[in-house]
Amino acid sequence: MALQQIVEQTVAGLGYDLVEIERSAGGLLRITIDLVWVPPTDEVSAAVGAEQFITVEDCEKVTRQLQFALEVEGVDYTRLEVSSPGIDRLLRNEADFKRFEGEVIDITLKQPMGAAAGGQVHANRKKFRGALERADSGGWQIVWSDEPPVKPGQRISKKRVPAPLQALGFTLDELREARLAPIVDFKGRGTKPGEPG
């Protein structure tokens, strides 16, 4: 049985989602897991499960089970690491894009924009950061503004005209990689978007 298959079966059997498998030099086998996402319904609000994360105990449980499975299958590795996806989680399929719709993501295209850029962005550009949205055509798009972020304490002129939003539509086949943007706010816990506060 192939490594991917062994790990997927073991992780799914324990009730987790396999995000990524990485083999590194020196025999390191790194497995990234996450909780299985269930799309919100009328009965289950989107807020339920939003604060659930992979714990150390989850990683320990998967590690123990994988050690047995990999030994039985004769997979050669020196060290096994099981971890949560972190703040820059890889987005690999349609379900991941649905789950993180509205979040800021970083994408890398397989090919540069070329003539399709139409002078809006540099023709050789392949990397973009923006809010993930569902496109009208049924695909996906990211929306961003090239306006620099406002610094804390900076005064904003009332006459200032905000930079226009730009959008880039794409299909999953056009992506080399997509990840959640690692944006960290060190100011403490604020209110979530959409909450009064």
From Swiss-Prot:
<protein>
    <recommendedName>
        <fullName>Ribosome maturation factor RimP</fullName>
    </recommendedName>
</protein>
<keyword id="KW-0690">Ribosome biogenesis</keyword>
<dbReference type="Pfam" id="PF02576">
    <property type="entry name" value="RimP_N"/>
</dbReference>
<dbReference type="GO" id="GO:0005829">
    <property type="term" value="C:cytosol"/>
</dbReference>
<dbReference type="InterPro" id="IPR003728">
    <property type="entry name" value="Ribosome_maturation_RimP"/>
</dbReference>
<dbReference type="InterPro" id="IPR028989">
    <property type="entry name" value="RimP_N"/>
</dbReference>
<dbReference type="InterPro" id="IPR035956">
    <property type="entry name" value="RimP_N_sf"/>
</dbReference>
<dbReference type="InterPro" id="IPR036847">
    <property type="entry name" value="RimP_C_sf"/>
</dbReference>
<comment type="function">
    <text>Required for maturation of 30S ribosomal subunits.</text>
</comment>
<dbReference type="GO" id="GO:0006412">
    <property type="term" value="P:translation"/>
</dbReference>
<keyword id="KW-0963">Cytoplasm</keyword>
<dbReference type="InterPro" id="IPR028998">
    <property type="entry name" value="RimP_C"/>
</dbReference>
<comment type="similarity">
    <text>Belongs to the RimP family.</text>
</comment>
<dbReference type="GO" id="GO:0000028">
    <property type="term" value="P:ribosomal small subunit assembly"/>
</dbReference>
